[in-house]
Swiss-Prot record:
GO terms for molecular function: ATP binding; ATP:ADP antiporter activity. This is ADP,ATP carrier protein 4. Belongs to the ADP/ATP translocase tlc family. The chain crosses the membrane at residues 44-64, 77-97, 109-129, 172-194, 205-225, 244-264, 309-329, 349-369, 378-398, 465-485, 493-513.
Amino acid sequence: MSENREIDATDRRDKTFDKEKLRPHVYSSVAGGMRSTSGDTKAVLLFSLLFALLSYIDAFLYVLGDMVMMNTQMPSSILFIKSVLVLPMTFFFIVIVQKGLRYLSQPRMLEVILIISSVFFLLFGFVIWPYCKRLQPDFFWSRDIFSDGKMKTRHLDFFFPIFLVFSEWASTMLYLVAELWGSLIISFMFFSRAIHQCTEAQVKKFLPTISLISAVVFLSSGLLTKSLNSRRDALPYHEKERLFSQVFIVTSALTVMSAITSFFTDRALAKDDPRHKGKKEHKVRKIGFAGSLKMMQKSRFLRAMTESVVAASVCSNIFEAIYRGGIVLGAVQSSTSKSSYMNRLNAMAQIITSIFLLVMFFKPATHLIERRGWFPVAITAPIVAIITLVLFFPMVFFNNITEGDLIASGEEYVGSFVLENYTGMFLTTIIRISKYCFFDVAKEAASIRVSPVHRHSFRGIHDGLGINIGKTIGSVYCTLVTVVFDVRDVRNVVSVSTVFVGVFCVIWIRSILHINKKYKESIERNDFINVELAEG
């Protein structure tokens, strides 16, 4: 009987390999089982190490990018970078990678990009940043143009953050790299490579470790940032600049280590299973923008999924923009340099995030869905957004009204902007956590109950299209509102933003209610969700 089971298992495996045009392999039951187990464990460990290295670089680049932007530019400059520069740079990067994949495998392409990034970090730390005063226009060039309200009288004051983006191009370049690292290097290249190379069993073992790895990375990065920030504050200017360059040496070394880890991961997987040597090409039917809109018109469920993703992205982007707008004022009140103050806030945010991720690793939201149902998990993020709207925005509005008095009054009012900053940091961090740990998990649970016929195309629309539309709406709104009201910061029109965000919170909740209705129906019928493609 056992021999028959082994033969049946081998036949099934061989048929699968024939279907995928791969060479079949027959293993003995004992040796094959041991090899499979050790191979899966090795793959999970290697990919976990690679993910940890890439995530640590991402966490540190986030801190460095914020630090240099606060030191040389202003929060509204970040909005311009996100709304105007990030998207074309993303498309350019993707096109380069796609062309490179014609000649290189996914692992080799990732390693080439990591080596190029390592060289960039060295150049930035030793050439671009130390000599940026000689390479860039004079520090006071754009500041003189907009000083003393000269452009305010011409209703052109909103151009000031844009001028800073191009005159302070060194900090803009670093912020762009920091912004693109997480979305392109990790999300686009690493995860597509992991899914491409790993078996289904290896992916199932690897995915639960992501939360734990991210928690450890954020905790260690937050503690290190806090420690370096304290040391940096006690140093003279030239020593601070030297320490900054040394940080880029470490970042470059970590990037090289990531490339080496990637290389050995590929070699180890190929050695354990020769099937990984060949590249599999899967043709996926692509749906354009017009096709996505037509499908959303037909399916109310898909429209609700996309609306919820767009609303979540818009709310989180605007909350963060308004929070960042008050950091400069908080630094002035606390008599701290802007970069040091920003580092302190980022370090605390990373530590808070790590604590929540550790809790969620041991008490995942998937268990809450099984116990409490889908709706309580999905509604957590919009409730946190509404709480932030009610608590944080009035605080910003009051501080805007009394801004001149608060800055001039000295010790009597010290703490109002600082309190706003720490409240904003905590609430935006909680929004981010609730979005990733609750809303995204609930969205994935609903997506899994969609028929496999539509699942891939639906996910491409509500995740791929929805997230990009949400980010674009948030960034473009923040940029346009400064133009319309002729202000330098979106924080100055928080009353308008309250209404705008409130509308998207309502859209978010309404979409969740519809998804919950369809999810419940599918559970009761013990069938896939009715996506209503035949309707409308």
